[in-house]
């Protein structure tokens, strides 16, 4: 028994010695063998692991290594292999077109554990690259060249603990997104002259960005965390970047999860530029031409699972300004079929329509349009309306456009579906009254069809004309209804083909007598009123009934009826040619001294109309006065006296 035990000990000792000798021999072999002779074997093994062609065109060395001093003692001295290879390339799959290679480097210094290889796990503890060039590509079929197998779960798993490089040229091409970006990346310790706002911790690299996104060029700079955070499943990549996307200035900061497990993320996004319309080349969202804007908020993206290709975007708690208008709210961009959907809720304390639709007249003047045209002939672009559907709710406490006249409590809901745009409902308060309306614009045919309907109730005249001191004594109210429809792809074309009508009525009240007397050129009363006080006269009513056909607005009735006079306006307005042709005929109810009351006319283009009395009646009265002056000075005043008439009360007819 004792003899057998000694024999077993000898066998065990010889076995241990043999293993130790084998290990020593293997260690000596690894350390002293010229591994250049084994490059075909090495590259074949690596190619089998990555399922991609691997080439080593320079020297190759294999040696033993241990972990850095930062590792725990329990793992630091476990033997691991270190591979140093020069001129290394990793090939691309046959379908890739962006570049011949996925990656290439002047040298690769890689240390990895041995035992995990038995479990088909490639644990790379340290990877140092010199001048790496990496081209990542996702094709139209959403295949990724950095994915080394088509199997849902690859046979081999790769884990990289530490990554270092001197300078990396990284290109990312995404065919479905129409994205092609290049990142010129260096360690942050060598960074110089990069100015990025907002603090993000753990920034280790800096990069310059260039390329294109859809139809917009991209140019900027950024800083980020360890690139290893983009490679491992549980990685995180802090990021901040600033630059131009097309004409828009973009500031981005936050933390990205690993792309390998990317289901959702959230970043802080700031945008600024000359016009919201400049976002279209990158976003394909047809926003209007506006005044300069700036906005900042939280951008988040989410998808259903790792295989989903559609992302839903949410821009939360954004706030900023467009021109002199403040804006805040939330927006969602949802990928749906047959078109994406934009949903937004926008609030404003002060909104200026000129900021959202800048002066089209000025834009057209720069384009060389005729100076006597005031209606915009700038073409709408309804083709862009097919890019998405939309549901947008806008509320504003105050809307300022005309001097001293403001709208309050504006609210409208914009719907866009299949190139049919509706604004319904549309509500706002004006001049202590209320305006309700509805607008439809149908771009499903070559020439857009538009229809607008507005109803105004109980608008106070003194609030409608706050700049006229003589109007402040008025307590009349305006009620009106307008309905117009037209066809065309510009404001000018829509009005040139307009059909519909406008009806309005001013209720009984008081208006400034000076306005009426000045309209009739009653010189004596006008001077008296200016010197001694602007008296008020009783307004029976004012009535307007305008019929619009084929762009011609005919005044069926336009009458202002007071206790003192009746003012009748007849004629028409040519909306196609932008021409006025109106007669204004005042008729006195009372005796007037020194009256030059005579019919007026308003003729000419919208941009510079001529408003004056007809010279015939005025000259006849002046000539008669001159002739009578030769007979008697008192008689000379007779032609300037208006005897007045017994006129019917127009309001009784309405």
Q: Which functions belong to the PLM regions below?
A:
Residues 1-51, 56, 634-648, 652-653:
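N-terminal type II signal-anchor transmembrane helix
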């Amino acid at each position: 028994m004792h003899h057998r035990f000694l024999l077993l000990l000898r066998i065990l000792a010889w076995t241990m010695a043999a293993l130790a000798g084998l290990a020593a021999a293997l260690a000596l072999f690894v350390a002293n063998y010229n591994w250049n002779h084994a490059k075909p074997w090495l590259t074949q093994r690596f190619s089998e692991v990555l399922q991609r062609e691997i080439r080593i065109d320079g020297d190759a060395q294999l040696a033993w290594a241990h972990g850095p001093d930062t590792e725990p003692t329990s793992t630091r001295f476990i033997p691991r292999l270190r591979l140093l290879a020069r001129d290394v390339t990793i090939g691309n799959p046959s379908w890739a077109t962006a570049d011949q290679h996925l990656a290439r480097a002047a040298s690769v210094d890689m240390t990895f554990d041995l035992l995990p290889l038995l479990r088909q796990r490639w644990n790379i503890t340290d990877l140092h690259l010199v001048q790496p060039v990496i081209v990542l590509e996702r094709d139209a079929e959403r295949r990724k060249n950095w994915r080394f197998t088509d199997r849902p779960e690859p046979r081999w798993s790769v884990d990289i603990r530490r990554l270092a490089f001197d300078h990396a040229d990284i290109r990312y091409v995404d065919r479905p997104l129409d994205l092609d970006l290049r990142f010129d990346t260096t360690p942050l310790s060598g960074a110089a002259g990069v100015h990025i706002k907002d603090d993000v911790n753990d920034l280790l690299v800096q990069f310059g960005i260039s390329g294109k996104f859809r139809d917009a060029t991209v140019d900027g700079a950024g800083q980020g965390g360890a690139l290893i955070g983009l490679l491992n499943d549980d990685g995180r990549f802090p990021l901040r970047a600033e630059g131009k996307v097309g004409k828009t200035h973009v500031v981005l900061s936050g933390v990205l999860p690993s792309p390998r497990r990317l289901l959702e993320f959230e970043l802080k996004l700031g945008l600024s530029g000359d016009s919201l319309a400049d976002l279209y080349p990158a976003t394909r969202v047809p926003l209007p031409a506006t005044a300069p804007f700036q906005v900042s908020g939280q951008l988040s993206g989410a998808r259903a699972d790792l295989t989903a290709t559609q992302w839903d975007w949410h821009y939360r708690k954004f706030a900023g300004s467009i021109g002199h208008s403040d804006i805040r709210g939330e927006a969602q961009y949802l990928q749906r079929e047959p078109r994406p959907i934009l949903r937004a809720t926008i609030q404003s304390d002060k909104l200026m329509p000129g900021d959202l639709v800048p002066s089209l007249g000025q834009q057209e003047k720069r384009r060389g349009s005729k100076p006597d045209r005031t209606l915009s002939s700038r073409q709408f672009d309804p083709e862009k309306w097919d890019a998405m559907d939309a549901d947008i709710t806008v509320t504003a406490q105050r809307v300022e456009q005309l001097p001293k006249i403001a709208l309050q409590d504006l609210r409208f809901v914009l719907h866009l579906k299949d190139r049919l745009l509706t604004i319904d409902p549309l509500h706002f308060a004006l001049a202590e009254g209320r305006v309700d309306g509805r607008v439809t614009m149908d771009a499903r045919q070559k020439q857009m069809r538009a229809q607008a309907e507005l109803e105004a109730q109980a608008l106070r005249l003194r609030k409608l004309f706050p700049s006229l001191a003589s109007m402040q004594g008025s307590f009349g109210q305006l009620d009106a209804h307008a309905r117009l429809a037209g066809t065309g792809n510009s404001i000018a074309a829509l009005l040139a083909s307009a059909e519909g009508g406008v009806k309005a009525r001013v209720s009984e009240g008081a208006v400034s007598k000076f306005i009426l007397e000045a309209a009739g050129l009653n010189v004596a009363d006008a001077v008296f009123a200016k010197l001694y006080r602007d008296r008020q006269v009783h307004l029976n009513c004012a009535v307007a009934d305008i019929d619009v056909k084929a762009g011609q607005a005919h005044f069926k009735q336009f009458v202002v009826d007071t206790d003192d006079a009746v003012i009748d306006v007849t004629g028409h307005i040519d909306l196609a040619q932008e021409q006025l042709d109106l007669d204004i005929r005042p008729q006195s109810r009372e005796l007037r001294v020194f009256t030059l009351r005579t019919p007026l006319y308003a003729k000419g283009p919208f941009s510079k109309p001529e408003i004056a009395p007809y010279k015939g009646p005025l000259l006849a009265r002046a000539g008669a006065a001159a002739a009578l002056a030769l007979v008697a000075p008192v008689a000379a005043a007779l032609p300037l006296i208006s005897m007045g008439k017994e006129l019917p009360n127009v309001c009784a007819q309405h």
